[in-house]
From Swiss-Prot:
Residues 63-288 form the OBG-type G domain. GO terms for cellular component: cytoplasmic vesicle; nucleus. It holds the Pfam family MMR_HSR1. The gene is DRG1. Residues 388-399 have a biased composition (Basic and acidic residues). It comes from the Eukaryota. Keywords: Cytoplasm, Cytoplasmic vesicle, GTP-binding, Lipid-binding, Nucleotide-binding. Residues 367-399 are annotated as: Disordered. This is Developmentally-regulated G-protein 1. NCBIfam families: small_GTP. InterPro entries: Beta-grasp_dom_sf, DRG, G_OBG, GTP-bd, GTP-binding_2, GTP1-OBG_CS, P-loop_NTPase, Small_GTP-bd. It comes from Arabidopsis thaliana (Mouse-ear cress).
Amino acid sequence: MGIIERIKEIEAEMARTQKNKATEYHLGQLKAKIAKLRTQLLEPPKGASGGGEGFEVTKYGHGRVALIGFPSVGKSTLLTMLTGTHSEAASYEFTTLTCIPGVIHYNDTKIQLLDLPGIIEGASEGKGRGRQVIAVAKSSDLVLMVLDASKSEGHRQILTKELEAVGLRLNKTPPQIYFKKKKTGGISFNTTAPLTHIDEKLCYQILHEYKIHNAEVLFRENATVDDFIDVIEGNRKYIKCVYVYNKIDVVGIDDVDRLSRQPNSIVISCNLKLNLDRLLARMWDEMGLVRVYSKPQGQQPDFDEPFVLSSDRGGCTVEDFCNHVHRTLVKDMKYALVWGTSTRHNPQNCGLSQHLEDEDVVQIVKKKERDEGGRGRFKSHSNAPARIADREKKAPLKQ
């Protein structure tokens, strides 16, 4: 019996089993078995060659967005309108057979947009080219799930199920569960929050299913069995997703209003070029990109080439800015002068941990510059008060 058949057999058993207090331990074990089998399904077969065409393209720009959806929902047309890159579009299905990249120039940043082939139900099991499509989606910073507003709402659930089957968690955050394997000592189970979905006994059974007999487990929130399995697997990708309903020009106003009110959703029409500007703004907000401008000593800020940080990847602190400029700048920095909305006054003397916001201006003062320049360095800043110069340290008073 193959892996896919075993997964379907366990799913059928779960569907037959009534959910109650007496069967929750058995269902938890079945969920762990399915998670293990799906992980094996994604592993490449032993001895397989590297032949075959893949979809992976070189990352470019300050972020990557993947277009996911069923065939003929308007992904290629959307790519052409947002990037100017030509992607073959037609009225028949499976027009796009490979990954077509494009670049969006927005707010002085470059965002890579990938038009992926349409996926079908069963893509997580290898049908069509679903595995390759989903693998590229895992490397993206944001997923745009393009849906046909005139089709059934079931398409959204099918696509979400296929993505979650391969370890993608849409619009979720990693569960607050600490898990660490040990060589000896048995299983240590602790919790700092009341648990209503899982208990110590079920936790032990799931760990034994993975043949883990020595580990430390700490629940910091009311997590579920699926959350605990995700932590054990350790290969889940938590990614933001925006549900883009296209072709709203062929449905009624009531349907448009209903779809637009759904969480993480936006309605557009590629045919009428409707709401595309709001889609770009939504993409920008979801990706959490932050532009930071550098200001050399005694010069005007460079507003042409910002340093782009991300709140999701890495962070948005002065230390992150220094690492973007040069890896040795953190060691050489004395302090930073920051102008912008993240400070109480302009400029503000800040350290490495200062959080930066969009369009902040940063000037790094190095240790050598401060030692050589002395107090006169601060006189070049028109906004700095006269008392900003360092005060000499006085010896403590004698008792």
